[in-house]
Amino acid sequence: MRRYPPGFLSLSASVACERFGFFLLTSLLLLYLNERLGFTTAQATDVLGCFIAATYVSPLLASAVTDGRFGIVRGTALGYIVAAAGYSLLVAESRPTMYAGLTLIALGAGAAKLAPQSLATRLFAAQPQLHDRGLTLIYLLANVSALVSPVIGETARAWFGWPAAFALASLSLVVASIIIQTQSHVLRSVEGKAGGSSDSGQAHGSGSLVMLLGLCVLAILFNLAQMQASSTLLLWTRDNTNRHLLGWELPVPYVASLHAGLVLAVSPLLARALLRLKIMPGLPTAAAKIALGMLATGLAYAPLVVAALLGHGGSLVGLGWLLGCLGLLSVGELLVGALGPSFVLRLAPPTRGGRWLGAWYGSTALGYWVAGRIGGLWDRVPHSLFFLGLAVLPLMGAAVSLCCHRWSTRL
């Protein structure tokens, strides 16, 4: 039986609880802003984009605290409590408390993002062979949270109202804080340890610089398209999709669960396909795999272009079009979202790996912000044209990835 180092399972459980609250919120936030607080579609998508972007910028602020005497463990526990306070403010159902709550949640999420990679690397310093499996477990638990939280959150909202859903999210963050503090003495003991060996900086020079800059551009285009699963695709599901299945109507927030479920379903199939590539000549580099992910992300919107043309005039279209889109988005998430940061660290010089990783996350934040702005076009342009634009932008990213692939084969 595989034994993980002490403290790791508690760390994983706390991450799962934190992700439960976050994914519960993102599955409901757009509808909450639009239907409950009276925001227009453009305003709601803008707020959503700014909020998610802030969760990728806030780790830079949180690192200033956790890198000092305060420490990663204390900073993470405090981040959970700050986020819990933010969720509790949403219970008030007013615009001022909503803005304050989202600010606190973004700050808390920033502190939480620092824990898994930093602490897991130190926990597995004596067992480097289990490091990747440990991170895979955290990723799996996070996706399980993404699968169940929209269902639980929407059920609570339907039965007891919006405050009940946000109260559940707040409770999950309190539980996360309690869990990590139960093993705080173990986790603090490894904070000062150096992480395991890194593959960063394997390639240097102008070629790797061009590739790193290309990856930052790619992060913008990728996340611009991926964020629509939490924004305009919910609106498409609500207003343009026939959601009736055997007499049961699929609640709109369940779309987020469908996406997470497809990620979990596609993951082993994709892993098996990539494993076969390892025994074939001409194994694709990470850049080529990322290019495939960008291609899948772009093609994901092709079914919705067709569906929008078929549904022109107000008629509802089948759920299969949406499932096709989400399935391809899941492939893109597994190839780009998972490989992108590690590829950045491999290319960056050892002394600048953190800076380039920060540039990647900064580009990710910019992509989410732009996605929120683009969402404002939902009510202004034909949906077929809107989805066509979302298809073209990731395909441009695929072209950038192919250029990176050519550079990598020359290095």
Residue ranges and their predicted role:
Residues 2-35, 208-232, 257, 327-331:
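Pair of pore-lining "gating" transmembrane helices in MFS-fold secondary transporters
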Residues 91-102, 303-322:
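Helix-loop junctions at membrane interfaces in 12-TM secondary transporters
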Residues 1-2, 6, 126-127, 153-248, ...:
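Intracellular loop-helix junctions on the cytosolic face of multi-pass helical membrane proteins
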Residues 130-158, 170-176, 259-260, 357-371:
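Glycine-rich segments within core transmembrane alpha-helices of 12-TM secondary carriers
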Residues 111-125, 334-348:
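Intracellular juxtamembrane helix-capping segments at the cytosolic ends
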